[in-house]
Amino acid sequence: MTRLILATRNAGKITELRAILADAGLTHDLVGADAYPDIPDVKETGVTFAENALLKAHALARATGLPAVADDSGLCVDVLGGAPGIFSARWSGRHGDDRANLDLLLAQLSDISEAHRGAHFACAAALALPDGTERVVEGQLRGTLRHTPTGTNGFGYDPVLQPEGETRTCAELSAEEKNAISHRGKAFRELVPVVRELLG
């Protein structure tokens, strides 16, 4: 069985990706980057989600000699011109501080009416092989931003995005419900046939 490295150390994301890929029928041995603690984090210097996903996937594939899958994702708010976008995880200035990022975003949108609170989650999922072969696919989840966080599931901005056609936020959905409609779920389900094509 081919080992496939998931280019993240985020435990929540590893769990989510394993579930999405397993549900899509991928049977490869999926291992998080946390299994390789000596490999340094990659600087996300790209200007798009796709560029950052490819940077991470290539770095891990080169360092391990194994195929690697990475994603870059974030929240794009219409009234903010697509921000925080690629800066979603460090919007408050502290990388990975979900609460601070969420608080800053809500403060920035405090005077914005419901009609102008449109946003979407975006995800670029990339596969890189040690020989340099690469593929990238993208997915989106459109919705509206609530004024206050609701729900305890998920992570990041999940407590404020209410997907189109839903009455609950992403953080109120079960993992299965969220994965079925999420930006990450869409992108990684699209990546599965690419993995099968390139890795067998």
Swiss-Prot record:
The keyword Magnesium is assigned to this record: yes
Sorted UniProt keywords: Hydrolase, Magnesium, Metal-binding, Nucleotide metabolism, Nucleotide-binding
Gene Ontology CC: cytosol
Cofactors required: Mg(2+)
BP terms from Gene Ontology: nucleotide metabolic process; purine nucleoside triphosphate catabolic process
Binding site for substrate: 8-13, 73, 155-158, 178, 183-184
Catalyses which reaction(s): XTP + H2O = XMP + diphosphate + H(+); dITP + H2O = dIMP + diphosphate + H(+); ITP + H2O = IMP + diphosphate + H(+)
Example GO molecular function: ribonucleoside triphosphate phosphatase activity
Catalytic machinery residues: 72 (proton acceptor)
Record has Magnesium as a keyword: yes
Membrane-spanning residues: none
Note on cofactor: Binds 1 Mg(2+) ion per subunit.
List of residues binding Mg(2+): 72
EC number annotated for this UniProt entry: 3.6.1.66
Family stated for the protein in its record: Belongs to the HAM1 NTPase family.
Function of the molecule: Pyrophosphatase that catalyzes the hydrolysis of nucleoside triphosphates to their monophosphate derivatives, with a high preference for the non-canonical purine nucleotides XTP (xanthosine triphosphate), dITP (deoxyinosine triphosphate) and ITP. Seems to function as a house-cleaning enzyme that removes non-canonical purine nucleotides from the nucleotide pool, thus preventing their incorporation into DNA/RNA and avoiding chromosomal lesions.
Assembly behavior: Homodimer.
PANTHER family, per database record: INOSINE TRIPHOSPHATE PYROPHOSPHATASE, INOSINE TRIPHOSPHATE PYROPHOSPHATASE/HAM1 PROTEIN
Protein name: dITP/XTP pyrophosphatase
